[in-house]
């Protein structure tokens, strides 16, 4: 099985998938040192969201401030010019995903920081497209089922399919953390900085957050 925790680049996966619906949940421990993982300190309350609009994701892309690329493109760029990768795993029917796309990612300061410090990937967890990078291939688990999760989403999220999920990878394509649920710009800024600057390697999240000075304007 492809292991995002410990392996930079390993083989193709075949997964038995347990599908879960779009929700906000208390974030679970996942990878690396618990003291240096943001998700271990977040305790988000269950919240209901209305769909913000009938905008399609094509419209979101057109209006987006973030330079979204495919995972294969991010992988190739990372090999030439190493930097972290941020993956936004979403679905087209997910209200909180649309809210994060239209508000958080389109905040000018957030978008500029992402573009300057990360390779940003937006991935539809129910896509029917084949994902290829290096010599590895990920496909939909069921082409005939529009709601079937993709192997890539199931792999990178350890089958914990809740949306949106923001995955942070280092420049070796090793997974650092998974942040689940909607976050506004001010909540997201310190997390971006923590993984974007590499402070997670030397500073515990609680210490970093305590000293962090917000600059984002809502």
What are these regions (language model features)?
Residues 139, 143, 149-167:
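Structural micro-motif
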Residues 110-146:
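Thiol-based oxidoreductase modules, predominantly thioredoxin-like and allied folds used
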Residues 66-83:
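A short beta-strand-turn-helix
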Residues 162-178:
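A short, hydrophobic beta-strand/beta-hairpin element that forms part of a small beta-sheet core
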């Amino acid at each position: 099985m492809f292991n995002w925790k410990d392996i930079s680049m390993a083989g193709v996966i075949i997964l038995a998938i347990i599908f879960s619906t779009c929700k906000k949940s208390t974030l679970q421990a996942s990878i690396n040192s618990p003291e240096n993982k943001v998700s271990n300190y977040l305790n988000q309350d269950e919240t209901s969201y209305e769909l913000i609009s009938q905008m399609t994701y094509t419209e979101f892309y057109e209006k987006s401030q973030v330079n979204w690329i495919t995972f294969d493109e991010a992988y190739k760029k990372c090999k030439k010019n190493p930097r972290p990768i941020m993956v936004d795993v979403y679905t087209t029917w997910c209200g909180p995903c649309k809210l994060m796309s239209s508000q958080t990612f389109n905040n000018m300061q957030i978008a500029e920081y992402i573009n300057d410090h990360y390779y940003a990937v937006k991935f539809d967890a129910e896509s029917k497209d084949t994902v290829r990078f290096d010599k590895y291939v990920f496909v939909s688990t069921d082409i005939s089922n529009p709601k079937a999760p993709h192997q890539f989403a199931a792999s990178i999220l350890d089958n914990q399919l809740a949306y949106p999920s923001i995955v942070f990878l280092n420049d070796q394509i090793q997974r650092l953390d998974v942040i689940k649920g909607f976050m506004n710009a001010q909540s997201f800024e310190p997390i971006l900085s923590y993984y974007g600057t590499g402070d997670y390697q030397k500073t515990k999240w609680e210490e970093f957050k305590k000293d962090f000075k917000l600059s984002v304007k809502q």
